[in-house]
Amino acid sequence: INLNIFRLGEEMNKLLIGDGGMGSELRFRGVEVPSHIESIWSALALTTNTQIIKEVHLDYIEAGAQYITANNYAVTQPILERADLANQLEDLTLLSLSIAKDAIQESGKDIKLAASLPPLETSYRADLILDYSKMYDQYQELANILEGEVDIIICETMAHSLEAKAALSTIQDSTSEKWLGWTLHGNRSNTLPSGENIIEAFEVTKDLKCDAYMINCCGVNMVT
């Protein structure tokens, strides 16, 4: 995962080291990670390989990560429904948090825990976003599960300004840090998959409380 994090306020110039991708590490360790287009992707390991998920978290901590991200990406209602796991939203989300918390405790280090408000539908597909009210309601359900459980909530891999607004709006009163992460499109510099310029997208969310902005899940050449 490629992250450029822009923190606001007093922390603005402080380097924060995060973890890396979960899916690629699971594959490297022999775990089946199906295509993100047709499945729950790396979240499948929550049903089959929880110990390896914890090992990935521990390895990132050992490598110097100051925060780790729970493996709840793709744990959304639309994606779970496609995998016949529609009634597992809360259970799988809480399981991902429990695994990460166990890793932090086992490490004995002061590590922050993050979790995702990911795209509700297939990642990078701005054309698949739901209407705003449905997005808001589904993000609110996820936000309610995460509230009080994590240090950071990341609105992650946002491909459309309204998707980002819906996700970020549901955590305005959260006690967790609020991060907003955009993804960029192919070789189109500064452009979201929706076709919006990132500055235009920022205008839609600029009045919402946000502790950090970031660019993720795109080539390093797009953000440097």
Regions found by a protein language model. Give the residues of each.
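Domain-level signal for soluble alpha/beta catalytic cores
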Residues: 4-224
